[in-house]
Swiss-Prot record:
This is 2,3,4,5-tetrahydropyridine-2,6-dicarboxylate N-acetyltransferase. It comes from the Bacteria. Belongs to the transferase hexapeptide repeat family. DapH subfamily. Keywords: Acyltransferase, Amino-acid biosynthesis, Diaminopimelate biosynthesis, Lysine biosynthesis, Repeat, Transferase. The keyword Acyltransferase applies. GO terms for molecular function: tetrahydrodipicolinate N-acetyltransferase activity. Catalyzes the transfer of an acetyl group from acetyl-CoA to tetrahydrodipicolinate. GO terms for biological process: diaminopimelate biosynthetic process; lysine biosynthetic process via diaminopimelate. The keyword Transferase applies. InterPro entries: DapH (IPR019873), DapH_N (IPR013710), Hexapep (IPR001451), Hexapep_transf_CS (IPR018357), Trans_hexapeptide_repeat (IPR050179), Trimer_LpxA-like_sf (IPR011004). Pathway: Amino-acid biosynthesis; L-lysine biosynthesis via DAP pathway; LL-2,6-diaminopimelate from (S)-tetrahydrodipicolinate (acetylase route): step 1/3.
């Protein structure tokens, strides 16, 4: 299976070197005085930008000096992914950090959390509440079930990430531990905890997960993906 495009040291450097920001939206009443930094956007009586740059502007607010601050991060090093040009279906409430790759016609459902450096193949669905940790790789036409966790590895930097092959189905609430590889065509049963590599075209289940059978025609029918859900 392929290596992640960003290794752990590159991600660590990216985070360490990034300017830490506290992004805010400020709605104010009154008149601002003084020049507005280029990195702060003003639309009517609303400011968008880093709190450290907006705070001094509010000190010069005249008249009633009333304002409301909305924020969802503090000293954040990694912004959220700009999703505007991604050729995939991404539902509201998914949290996807920058430096994530998402293939064509992938589906990211509500509440999914995808950390920096993760890669999602074309046609793969990440279901509701699933978590892909840093550098986790999922191949093409796979399904990561609701509440499943693919453990991430940014530190320690020497650790290997989770790698999931093509045409894999991971059941709801399953957990795949750091460094584990799931072979293409395999099925991980719901609730399984996978601590060792899984070969291709098998079904694993249990805690810890063990091979219980080879993929057969009946299993393929029960775990078949629906292309219609991936239509844009």
């Amino acid at each position: 299976m392929s290596a992640t495009k960003m290794n752990a040291q590159e991600i660590i450097k990216f985070i360490a070197d990034a300017k830490k920001k506290t992004p805010v939206k400020v709605t104010f009443d009154g008149e601002l005085h003084g020049s507005i930094p280029w990195s702060v956007v003003k639309l009517g009586n609303v400011l968008f930008g880093d709190w450290e740059e907006i705070k001094p502007l509010l000190a010069n607010l005249e008249e009633n000096k009333t304002y409301v601050v909305e924020q969802d991060a503090r000293n954040s090093a990694v912004p959220l992914l700009d999703k505007r040009d991604i050729n995939a279906r991404i539902e509201p409430g998914a949290i996807i950090r920058d430096q994530v790759e998402i293939g064509d016609n992938a589906v990211i459902m509500m509440g999914a959390v995808i950390n920096i450096g993760a890669e999602i193949g074309a046609g793969t669905m990440i279901d509701m509440g699933a978590i892909l940790g840093g550098r986790a790789i999922v191949g093409k036409n796979s399904h990561v079930g609701a509440g499943a966790v693919l453990a991430g590895v940014i530190e320690p930097a020497s650790a290997e990430p989770v790698r999931v092959g093509d045409n894999v189905l991971i059941g709801a609430n399953a957990v795949v531990i750091e460094g584990v590889q799931i072979g293409s065509g395999s099925v991980v049963a719901a609730g399984a905890i996978v601590t060792q590599d899984v070969p291709e075209n098998v079904v694993v289940a249990g805690v810890p997960a063990r091979v219980i059978k080879t993929i057969d025609e009946k299993t393929q029918q029960k775990t078949a993906l629906e292309d219609a859900l991936r239509t844009l």
